[in-house]
């Protein structure tokens, strides 16, 4: 290989091509590559921000769900307590009403017992008067002996 003028001319042409490429071709390519890198970086940053926002939104949703569950459980517990209180109150009222009915029935039975005893006393007094009348074979005046008959009733 001999070095002659064509090699120098080719070197100069290559150098001019390199300078032309560096001056006119390379800057738009570099600019396009930089813009592309910037877009990719912006896209990655937006994706990271969206991922962070999504995680924050999921966390807020979980917190709100937990709060809602707690409120629901609290409301259910309150409703159960109220229902239990209403049931207990109804039981107490029913028991009280039952006790009143039993007391009234007892009082009525006691009154009927007293009335029956009074009726029996009067019948016994009348029988005693008739028996005494038959024994004595004379008539006993109930109006005259009312005090005696009343004492006889109380003793019976």
From Swiss-Prot:
Domain of life: Bacteria
This protein's record includes keyword Plastid: no
Membrane topology recorded in Swiss-Prot or TrEMBL: Single-pass membrane protein
Gene Ontology molecular function: proton-transporting ATP synthase activity, rotational mechanism; proton-transporting ATPase activity, rotational mechanism
Annotated InterPro entries: ATP_synth_B-like_membr_sf, ATP_synth_b/b'su_bac/chlpt, ATP_synth_F0_bsu_bac, ATP_synthase_B_chain
Pfam families in the record: ATP-synt_B
Keywords per UniProt: ATP synthesis, Cell inner membrane, Cell membrane, CF(0), Hydrogen ion transport, Ion transport, Membrane, Transmembrane, Transmembrane helix, Transport
Listed GO CC annotations: plasma membrane; proton-transporting ATP synthase complex
Regions crossing the membrane: 7-27
Cellular location(s): Cell inner membrane
NCBIfam families per the UniProt record, alphabetical: ATP_synt_b, PRK05759.1-2
Assembly and binders: F-type ATPases have 2 components, F(1) - the catalytic core - and F(0) - the membrane proton channel. F(1) has five subunits: alpha(3), beta(3), gamma(1), delta(1), epsilon(1). F(0) has three main subunits: a(1), b(2) and c(10-14). The alpha and beta chains form an alternating ring which encloses part of the gamma chain. F(1) is attached to F(0) by a central stalk formed by the gamma and epsilon chains, while a peripheral stalk is formed by the delta and b chains.
Family per record: Belongs to the ATPase B chain family.
Biological role stated in the UniProt entry: F(1)F(0) ATP synthase produces ATP from ADP in the presence of a proton or sodium gradient. F-type ATPases consist of two structural domains, F(1) containing the extramembraneous catalytic core and F(0) containing the membrane proton channel, linked together by a central stalk and a peripheral stalk. During catalysis, ATP synthesis in the catalytic domain of F(1) is coupled via a rotary mechanism of the central stalk subunits to proton translocation.
PANTHER family assigned: ATP SYNTHASE SUBUNIT B, ATP SYNTHASE SUBUNIT B', CHLOROPLASTIC
Protein's name according to its UniProt entry: ATP synthase subunit b
Gene that encodes it: atpF
């Amino acid at each position: 290989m001999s070095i002659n003028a064509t090699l120098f001319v080719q070197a100069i042409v290559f150098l001019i091509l390199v300078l032309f490429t560096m001056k006119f071709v390379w800057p738009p390519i570099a600019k396009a590559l930089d813009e592309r890198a910037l877009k990719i970086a912006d896209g990655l940053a937006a994706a990271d921000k969206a991922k962070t926002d999504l995680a924050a939104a999921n966390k807020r949703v979980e917190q709100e769900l937990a709060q809602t569950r707690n409120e629901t459980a609290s409301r259910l517990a309150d409703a159960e307590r109220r229902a239990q209180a209403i049931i207990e109150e109804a039981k107490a009222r029913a028991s009280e009403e039952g006790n009143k009915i039993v007391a009234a029935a007892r009082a009525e039975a006691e009154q009927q017992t007293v009335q029956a005893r009074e009726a029996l006393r009067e019948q016994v007094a009348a029988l005693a008067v008739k028996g005494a009348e038959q024994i004595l074979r004379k008539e006993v005046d109930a109006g005259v002996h009312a005090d005696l008959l009343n004492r006889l009733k109380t003793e019976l």
